[in-house]
Amino acid sequence: MSLPSWRPSSDTMKECVEIFATLGTRLATFGHTERDKAIIASAIEQNGWFTSEDILRAVEAIRLEMLDRDKLQLWLSRYTPTTHPQRVAIIMAGNIPLVGFFDLLCTLCSGHHAYIKPSSKDRVLM
């Protein structure tokens, strides 16, 4: 299988900041709608170790620590995007809600291609 001829640049990192900061903004209200509550209930049904408090705490931590626009810009400003994207396999654990999110964020923002095997216990959230 051939990968697209995409070459990361500083514009790619800016785009990454925009996309993930927008996701952070959208997650600010997660857990308040009936749809969100159904997603949480489905995740708990899939993984009996998850609680709604754990899920909400994970989403809030991701939003505040990983998806804050200023923090993303500062973090990514320290790196140069790759000029030779690699395929990065991410095998996600399912013991903590959304535990594989940071791996995905790092892979995509560095300009690599993510190949993900989500945990069978965290498919609803990821």
Task: Please tell me what each predicted stretch does.
Residues M1-A89:
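N-terminal Rossmann-like NAD(P)+-binding subdomain of aldehyde/semialdehyde dehydrogenases
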Residues L74-M126:
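Conserved small-residue-rich beta-alpha loop and adjacent elements
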